[in-house]
Amino acid sequence: MFPRSILLALSLTAVALGQQVGTNMAENHPSLTWQRCTSSGCQNVNGKVTLDANWRWTHRINDFTNCYTGNEWDTSICPDGVTCAENCALDGADYAGTYGVTSSGTALTLKFVTESQQKNIGSRLYLMADDSNYEIFNLLNKEFTFDVDVSKLPCGLNGALYFSEMAADGGMSSTNTAGAKYGTGYCDSQCPRDIKFIDGEANSEGWEGSPNDVNAGTGNFGACCGEMDIWEANSISSAYTPHPCREPGLQRCEGNTCSVNDRYATECDPDGCDFNSFRMGDKSFYGPGMTVDTNQPITVVTQFITDNGSDNGNLQEIRRIYVQNGQVIQNSNVNIPGIDSGNSISAEFCDQAKEAFGDERSFQDRGGLSGMGSALDRGMVLVLSIWDDHAVNMLWLDSDYPLDASPSQPGISRGTCSRDSGKPEDVEANAGGVQVVYSNIKFGDINSTFNNNGGGGGNPSPTTTRPNSPAQTMWGQCGGQGWTGPTACQSPSTCHVINDFYSQCF
């Protein structure tokens, strides 16, 4: 994952805890209902979400003067990191008006660009247990299920849902006074340096504004921790990826230990062991009108299988299942020379994939699947986000990457997006209507969160990719280059040409 990752809060000093709380705007967390499930059924949990601290207004205590404007610090308020943390406060958020975040029942909608007094790009939110603590998920021998609508996410965008090994209180007990209520304590496996506050000090020393992002920059420090990417996706490509670290919890890095000169110098695995169906050789599995049809909402099931079938076992396998239109769809099978034809992430899969693609073995060197399992056992925070990529334009997800390699080389092609796509200036300028919707989050015992009707339990069974009737159903594919399925539509819908490759019934 290559996210814009920003952490505010954390201080180990006893004199003053870093990152204060502002009083200019009340903080009202949007509600989000989700479910805990067992073989007996599912029970509602009345949850809430909070906005990551980095998106929030950061101002001088007791007035309205910005501590940080654009991508620069005010050095009169922030002459050094310690003083800055003592002087600056986080404030409440206007979720819908400023950030384009709305919730309704079990659904959370994140708009990519929101125009208010200023232009906001993207967002990152965390599921809360209460108003002061994040919900902690222990995922071993469990499954996590959610619905997602990526139909309005084009090339270059990423609707990412993942877990991060953050502190439940956002560091409030030891490092700051704002805490999880205000979205503090973020970290991930990229050891991001675009974090404004870390270990109770502003990351202002050595800070340089980004040359292509008016809101971000990088400082001397970064925040590292384990990350389990359940879902990184747009309408063209998707991937799920474990990223282990050598040490538990949030670890601060500095200089080259934050990958300043060497991507693989950190304590965490930046690459992960990813399963992207397109990259793994099935180029007709995921996308508009494909087996998993991104024109429609998708139910995504991820299972964390242990070696002894108990919560105390060792992580052995990470499985992926989809449900769409009441049908269970098994994950695509690998079709790459040198990799066994499976459809899940295991230690063997990761070893073979790294060898077949010629990738660095940073995943194995940081503990591999066992290391990821340890983080899952300790507990992780759920992150829901939408973002674009100012580093490499999201090509690692949906196009050819790296660009200096031949697309014919195994592992280079990850999707059908153009090599010129995903530039932030383009996707941000053409962002009308771009959004992601997450809904129906469920967590519980294996096979308790879904069945052939999309919920409730039962063992998965495979489905075909084409309807049995001679006419296509409403919203189904009815034409396009290479299409061999039905070309007539069930009444009252008719077939409409969307592009050369895809026609749809509506």
Swiss-Prot record:
Broadest EC class assigned to this enzyme: hydrolase
Keyword Signal in annotation: yes
Signal sequence interval, chain numbering: 1-18
Catalytic residues in the record: 227, 232
Residues bearing carbohydrate: 308, 447
Keyword annotations of the record: Carbohydrate metabolism, Cellulose degradation, Disulfide bond, Glycoprotein, Glycosidase, Hydrolase, Polysaccharide degradation, Signal
Compositional bias ranges of the Polar residues kind: 406-419
Biased composition (Low complexity): 460-470
Chain segments carrying region Linker: 451-473
Cystine pairings recorded for this chain: 478-495, 489-505
InterPro entries: CBD_sf, Cellulose-bd_dom_fun, ConA-like_dom_sf, Glyco_hydro_7, Glyco_hydro_7_sf
Region (Disordered): 405-426, 449-472
Entries under Gene3D superfamilies matching the protein: Glycoside hydrolase, family 7, domain
Annotated EC: 3.2.1.91
The UniProt record lists the keyword Calcium: no
Positions of the UniProt region annotated as Catalytic: 19-450
Domain CBM1 stretches: 470-506
Recorded superkingdom: Eukaryota
Gene Ontology CC: extracellular region
Pfam families associated with the record: CBM_1 (PF00734), Glyco_hydro_7 (PF00840)
Its biological purpose: The biological conversion of cellulose to glucose generally requires three types of hydrolytic enzymes: (1) Endoglucanases which cut internal beta-1,4-glucosidic bonds; (2) Exocellobiohydrolases that cut the disaccharide cellobiose from the non-reducing end of the cellulose polymer chain; (3) Beta-1,4-glucosidases which hydrolyze the cellobiose and other short cello-oligosaccharides to glucose.
PANTHER family from the UniProt entry: 1,4-BETA-D-GLUCAN CELLOBIOHYDROLASE B (PTHR33753), GLYCOSIDE HYDROLASE FAMILY 7 PROTEIN (PTHR33753:SF2)
Family that this chain belongs to: Belongs to the glycosyl hydrolase 7 (cellulase C) family.
Protein's UniProt name: Exoglucanase
Lineage summary: Eukaryota, Fungi, Dikarya, Basidiomycota, Agaricomycotina
